[in-house]
């Protein structure tokens, strides 16, 4: 297997996968996640894990703009390590030069019992390998930084942190009772979100594979970070299998044809099934190639036909059995309506029914859902 621009790192435990034994260090890792930027400008964030079994995740992307292993979070309180200072570990970012074509970014996560092993590997794998005697060229620039914000796109929010906890339900007595679920709290931040505090049009889009039941999908404004916190509670059906989840935030805006950003799709069978399931939902159309969600609200109010006027008639002589109302004489100005239905009253005089006109309609302008954040793509390892 050819791996281009390989990166290595270490992840022992973190907020998304807490230590299995008591430890004063809340997080212990050189990198917290894998970041990928696609050619269309879409971003994906994959929090790292220390799985019990070898795990390889593949993300299909053509002509990537960049990928890297980043250390998001520079507060000493996250690590509390005076010796190794994980809060000062740099991030590594690969910036391809030119077009690399089709391929995948692969993430390898290797089980480790201590922090001395580099158990994380990321690299680019081209879709087509060269024939014997042919040349392949992949030029790129390697960036080292402790300013992860300089890598992020200002047009999209990003994931500040992913926290994992036991799921619970608040009872009427305010006591939280565990319900057998797992909870994931995903904090989205960034200037584009800070500029829209408590925007009611922002919503979450969540997909999961078939191995999990989503029991809560709750999005709240976070006044501390000036971003949004997404809370997901899930129940895993078969813990011996890994579980895939994806989420991002959307905002309703007027439709702009031809300006629909695509979403990077992890090359996972489970995620493809989840995307197909989302596409089948009413009122939602999802482009399978780009996983882009667009909701149109162009339904106009139904027009009501004008009711015919009722003619004056002698009492007791209305044709109630057939439900036919006699029609009054038409105004002189409407007597020449060519499509009016002719009728006769009891005296044989000819009258005309005015032509029915549809009520005016005022359809709402079409809306679309704009992607506001990078895609959070998380794998819950097997046997967790």
From Swiss-Prot:
Pathway named in the protein's UniProt entry: Glycan metabolism; osmoregulated periplasmic glucan (OPG) biosynthesis
Gene Ontology, cellular component aspect: outer membrane-bounded periplasmic space
InterPro entries the UniProt entry points to: Gal_mutarotase_sf_dom, GH-type_carb-bd, Glucan_biosyn_MdoG/MdoD, Glucan_biosyn_MdoG_C, Ig-like_fold, Ig_E-set
Gene3D superfamilies per the UniProt record, alphabetical: 2.70.98.10, Immunoglobulins
Biased composition (Basic and acidic residues): 294-352
Region (Disordered): 276-384
Annotated keywords: Periplasm
Molecular function in Gene Ontology: carbohydrate binding; catalytic activity
One GO process term, biological-process aspect: beta-glucan biosynthetic process
Record has rRNA-binding as a keyword: no
Compositionally biased intervals (Polar residues): 370-384
Superkingdom of origin organism: Bacteria
Reported function: Involved in the biosynthesis of osmoregulated periplasmic glucans (OPGs).
Family, per entry: Belongs to the OpgD/OpgG family.
Name the record gives this protein: Glucans biosynthesis protein G
Naturally occurring in which organism (per UniProt): Pseudomonas syringae pv. syringae
């Amino acid at each position: 297997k050819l791996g281009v621009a390989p990166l290595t790192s270490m992840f022992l435990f973190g907020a998304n996968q807490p230590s299995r034994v008591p430890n004063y260090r809340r997080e212990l890792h050189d990198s917290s996640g894998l970041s990928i930027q696609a050619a269309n400008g879409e971003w994906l964030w994959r929090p790292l894990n220390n799985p019990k079994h070898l795990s390889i995740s593949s993300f299909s992307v053509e002509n990537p703009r960049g990928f890297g292993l980043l250390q998001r979070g520079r507060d000493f309180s996250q690590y509390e390590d005076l010796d190794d200072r994980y809060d000062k570990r740099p991030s590594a970012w690969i910036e391809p030069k030119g077009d690399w074509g089709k391929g995948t970014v692969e993430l390898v996560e290797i089980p480790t019992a201590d922090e001395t092993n580099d158990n994380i590997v990321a690299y680019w794998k081209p879709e087509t390998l060269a024939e014997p005697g042919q040349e392949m060229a992949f030029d790129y620039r390697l960036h080292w930084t402790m300013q992860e914000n300089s890598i992020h796109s200002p047009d999209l929010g990003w994931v500040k942190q992913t926290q994992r906890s036991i799921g619970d339900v608040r009872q009427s007595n305010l006591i939280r009772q565990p319900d057998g679920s797992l909870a994931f709290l995903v904090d989205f931040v960034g200037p584009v979100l800070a500029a829209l505090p408590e925007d009611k049009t922002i919503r979450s889009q969540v997909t999961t594979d078939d191995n999990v039941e989503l029991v809560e999908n709750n999005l709240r404004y976070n006044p501390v970070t000036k971003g949004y916190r997404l809370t997901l509670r899930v129940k895993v059906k078969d813990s011996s299998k890994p579980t895939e989840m994806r989420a991002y935030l959307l905002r309703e805006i007027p439709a702009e044809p031809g300006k629909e950003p695509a979403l990077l799709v992890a090359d996972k069978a489970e995620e493809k099934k989840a995307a197909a399931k989302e596409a089948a939902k009413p009122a939602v159309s999802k482009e399978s190639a780009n996983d882009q969600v667009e909701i149109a609200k162009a339904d106009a109010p139904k027009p009501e036909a004008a009711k015919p006027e009722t003619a004056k008639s002698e009492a007791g002589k209305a044709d109630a059995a057939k439900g036919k109302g006699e029609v009054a004489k038409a105004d002189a100005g409407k007597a020449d309506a060519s499509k009016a239905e002719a009728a006769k009253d009891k005296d044989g005089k000819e009258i005309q029914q005015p032509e029915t006109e549809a009520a005016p309609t005022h359809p709402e302008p079409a809306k679309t859902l704009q992607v506001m954040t990078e895609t959070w793509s998380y794998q819950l390892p097997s046997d967790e």
